[in-house]
Amino acid sequence: MNDRMILVVDDETELLEMVRSIFMRAGFTQVLTASSGEAALKVCKEKQPDMVILDVMMPGMDGFATLKELRRISKIPVLMLTARGEAEDKFAGFENGADDYLLKPFLPKELLFRVQAILKRAYPGKDRKVFFDTATVDL
């Protein structure tokens, strides 16, 4: 079980539900969704999620503008999950503060691995374990 709060932002309802389901099946207990950049910023201010998975192409405030505003107010880790795969798009994501950039379509397992790696780097003091022979100690 993972109690980290993940916010998934995309204007496609089916994709939101699919990504939410992927994380719930993987043991994440708090997976929030937002269908616009504006809604995502509101959720981030109110709920303070541990990580955001953010689409680029959305009506109104796109993912790059959302990321730029999010970086102005927070250091929440962000993974861009988008169909925009041109080098310039990736560079824009990283220049605006994205922690990772993954193209659609994606492999669910790859998304999970990337998110888990980002969370480990962003919150290194949490979820630490020490192994002694057959015993495991949570620090």
Model-based region annotation:
Residues S36-A39, D62-A65, D89:
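Acidic catalytic/metal-coordinating carboxylates
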Residues M58:
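Receiver (REC) domain active-site loop signature in two-component systems and cognate sites
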Residues D10, D55, T82:
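Active-site residues of response regulator receiver
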Residues K42, D62-K75:
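Short amphipathic alpha-helix used as the core "switch/output" element in two-component signaling
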Residues R4-M5, A117-L139:
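Short, Lys/Arg-enriched segments at the junction into DNA-binding effector domains
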Residues T13-L32:
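Two-component/phosphorelay signaling modules centered on CheY-like receiver
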Residues T33-M51:
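Acidic, metal-coordinating helix/loop segments flanking the phosphotransfer/catalytic sites
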